[in-house]
Swiss-Prot record:
GO biological process: alpha-amino acid biosynthetic process; arginine catabolic process to glutamate; arginine catabolic process to succinate; ornithine catabolic process
Keywords noted in UniProt: Aminotransferase, Arginine metabolism, Pyridoxal phosphate, Transferase
Reactions that this protein is recorded to catalyse: N(2)-succinyl-L-ornithine + 2-oxoglutarate = N-succinyl-L-glutamate 5-semialdehyde + L-glutamate
Cofactor(s) recorded in Swiss-Prot or TrEMBL: pyridoxal 5'-phosphate
GO function terms (MF aspect): identical protein binding; pyridoxal phosphate binding; succinylornithine transaminase activity
Function, in words: Catalyzes the transamination of N(2)-succinylornithine and alpha-ketoglutarate into N(2)-succinylglutamate semialdehyde and glutamate. Can also act as an acetylornithine aminotransferase.
Sites bearing N6-(pyridoxal phosphate)lysine, chain numbering: 252
Transferase recorded as keyword: yes
Name the record gives this protein: Succinylornithine transaminase
Pathway(s) the chain acts in: Amino-acid degradation; L-arginine degradation via AST pathway; L-glutamate and succinate from L-arginine: step 3/5
Family under the similarity heading: Belongs to the class-III pyridoxal-phosphate-dependent aminotransferase family. AstC subfamily.
């Protein structure tokens, strides 16, 4: 018999680094979830841009079950067929020539930063170790990646931090140019700052970073953990901008809910990562790569990408209608199905309260700081689910505006 558990048990048993919602989801199908009490929710959070094909997608379940009936794990002393097939699919679909598999976005970014430092050290010298990142970015929670993230709130308690990491203002080429020099080994940037407020980069900004990296022989790293695998209406956001990085990191949606991460790069850069320079126990395991291979098959099609663009338009139209009614947002921004509603000054700091009210109304949304409500729904969310979910979101906005909202 299974142990009966409640939300209160989290506070009793778990390390308190999160404050989960007061309900526990127990079942999902497509873009809908149900909690322990049977209440239904439309899911516009998508596990923070992870569940790209919704919950319990039949093709992903089939891929997982098929591999689970074969074998689960061997370790990095052996390779496996699903990992090799997935690597080839990623290479064929992108600029990359080499792939490193891991288990998360943080691990992918850690590998990217280590590669950049080693490449510079091997080809130029140990003095070329500087990393330029951007304020309010997010690249993970390892000590290296949280230091690159540019949000002191996440890193200030863990000093001393890795040295030679400096932060420029996002979308400010002059600020970046002042920091990038011949001692810079890498520039790491999100094409859309997700945690930082759903802020898309300008094309000129990314083009300028590409030119600066070329001039100073630094590697350009695109952190596409959140923007990747169809989220922006292209398989990867670099395709939207027409700016090709030297290294790309991907995770989240790549596994459709099953943990996986990957670092993509060229043969020249990958060549410095010789046996023993880096590694992972679970990375590239057959369960994760079998599921991810099926995710890529489904998402990397013109039909799916066109569908993302159409759904983007549907969200924007309905969110604008909501804003006409309530006047709560100063801006609605983002690419594809990564969207952010920026709160007006009078509602500043209330994004979390709106998310809580939305859950009470039966729709799950995210926040990106205190002033931005974030949406990252499944890429195949239906028109009916968009309409129903945003009707529920409108109810949450109405409650907040009329003072009917309550903290909790």
């Amino acid at each position: 018999m299974s142990l009966s558990v409640t939300r209160e048990n989290f506070d009793e048993w778990m390390v308190p680094v999160y404050v989960p919602a007061p309900f526990i989801p127990v079942r999902g199908e497509g873009s809908r979830l149900w909690d322990q009490q049977g209440k239904e929710y439309i899911d516009f959070a998508g596990g923070i841009a992870v569940n790209a094909l919704g919950h319990a997608h039949p093709a992903l379940r089939e891929a997982l079950n098929e591999q689970a009936n074969r074998f689960w794990h061997t370790g990095n002393g052996y390779t496996n067929e699903p990992a090799l097939r997935l690597a080839k699919k990623l290479i064929d679909a992108t600029f990359a020539e080499r792939v490193f598999f891991c288990n998360s976005g943080a691990e992918a970014n850690e590998a990217a930063l280590k590669l950049a430092r080693k490449y510079a050290h091997d080809r130029v010298g140990n003095h070329k170790s500087g990393i330029v990142a951007f304020k309010n970015a997010f690249h993970g929670r390892t000590l290296f990646t949280v230091s690159a993230g540019g949000q002191p709130t996440y890193s200030q308690d863990f000093a001393p931090l890795p040295p030679d990491i400096r932060h420029a203002a996002y979308n400010d080429l002059n600020s970046a140019s002042a920091l990038i020099d011949d001692n810079t080994c890498a520039v790491i940037v999100e094409p859309v700052q997700g945690e930082g407020g759903v802020i898309p980069a300008t094309k000129a900004f990314l083009q300028g970073l590409r030119e600066l990296c070329d001039r100073h022989q630094a590697l350009l790293i695109f952190d596409e953990v959140q923007t990747g695998v169809g989220r922006t209406g292209e398989l990867y956001a670099y395709m939207h901008y027409g700016v090709t990085p030297d290294i790309l990191t991907t995770a989240k949606a790549l596994g459709g809910g099953f943990p996986i991460g990957a670092m993509l790069t060229t043969q020249d850069y990958a060549s410095v990562m010789t046996p023993g320079t880096h590694g992972t126990t679970y990375g590239g395991n057959p369960l994760a790569t079998a599921v991810a291979g099926k995710v890529l098959d489904i998402i990397n099609t013109p039909e799916m990408q066109n569908g993302v663009r159409q759904r983007h338009d549907a969200f924007i139209e309905r969110l604008n209608t909501i804003n006409v009614r309530f006047g709560m947002f100063s801006e609605i921004r983002g690419l594809g199905l990564l969207l952010g509603c920026v709160l007006q000054t009078e509602f500043a700091g209330k994004a979390k309260l709106i998310a809580q009210e939305a859950a009470k109304a039966g729709v799950m949304v995210l926040i990106a700081g205190g002033d931005v409500v974030r949406f990252a729904p499944a890429l195949n969310v239906s028109d009916e689910e968009i309409a129903t979910g945003l009707d529920r979101f409108a109810l949450a906005c109405e409650r907040l505006q009329t003072g009917g909202a309550s903290c909790g």
